[in-house]
A protein has these predicted regions:
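Short conserved AdoMet
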Residues: 30-31, 83, 105, 146
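Small-residue helix-packing motif on alpha-helices
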Residues: 35, 191-198, 220, 231
């Protein structure tokens, strides 16, 4: 089934992640004629009508695509326009569904999403949570997010936060790993540009291999590592007690902890 925006659909704000989603929808051939981007700057969004003030009609679909810190500034003008026929979709990190419900009490449904940057290439992961309906009842949202890649429908907001740390923030962590791999190659004598290209293609190729073969990452590591070979020696460093796993555990813990702090800050403003 082709994803279709309920009409009229508003995208309030269009930051980096919201812009990536628009790029992915357009790349996937989704009809954007029902969508209006509303942003104070009036900065155009390619392929989508962009205005600076809210239209007169009540929206059927609203997606919040600005920074969480601007929520209360936006609510004053937007909340009176969100009615019983409006599905409100939020990508605001750390702002709980209950906080959104308090600010938009008339909304038909409140849906939280956590997309990641590869949605722009229709290769994303989008976590979805709502207490106001299941996947069938919120099929418009499900189809729109599925058109950008993989979706993960969450049973709790805690699960949404964990997937956000693994997938949304995880893009930055994978990119930082690739950067570190390139720097290590450069330190061993590779030219800077060459090291970067090799590291990037290694990440791309590993993902493509996993997708094509259905192999788990652990299986790929075992395939590459010959007994007593060079790869095995390197993996021994990564697998040490103070190696990669505990480092990533601390990394995700820090991200999730910050998400909880943001949620507490938003709740304190309720």
């Amino acid at each position: 089934m082709t994803a279709v925006f309920p009409a009229p659909a508003w995208l309030v704000g269009c930051g980096n992640m919201a812009g990536a989603m628009v790029e992915g929808w357009r790349a996937g051939g989704i009809d954007m004629s029902a969508v209006t981007v509303i942003r104070p700057s009036g900065k155009p969004v390619e392929g989508v009508r962009t205005i600076t003030t809210y239209p007169d009609e009540k929206p059927a679909f609203v997606m919040l695509g600005f920074k969480p810190q601007k929520l209360d500034e936006v609510v004053a003008g937007l909340a009176p326009l969100v009615g019983a026929g409006t599905t409100l979709v939020s990508m605001l990190a750390g702002v709980a569904a209950a906080s959104l419900r308090g600010r938009f009490p008339e909304a038909k449904a409140i849906v939280r999403i956590m997309p990641n940057l590869p949605v722009a290439q229709v290769q994303g992961v989008t976590a979805i949570y709502s207490a106001d309906g299941n996947q069938d009842e919120l099929h418009d949202v499900r189809q729109l997010m599925a058109s950008l890649g993989m979706i993960a429908w969450c049973e709790t907001e805690e699960e949404l936060g964990v997937i956000g740390a693994v997938a949304a923030a995880g893009v930055a962590y994978v990119a930082r790993f690739g950067e570190a791999l390139a720097r290590s190659g450069e330190a061993l004598g590779l030219r800077s540009v060459q090291a970067q290209m090799v590291a990037e293609q290694t990440l791309i190729g590993t993902g493509a291999f996993a997708a094509a073969t259905g192999s788990h990452m652990a299986d790929i590591a075992r395939q590459v590592a010959s007994p007593k070979g060079t790869t095995e020696q390197g993996l021994a460093v990564l697998d040490a007690a103070d190696g990669l796993q505990p480092l990533l555990d601390r990394t995700l813990d820090a991200a999730i902890r910050r998400g909880k702090e943001l949620a507490a800050e938003a709740a304190a403003r309720d």
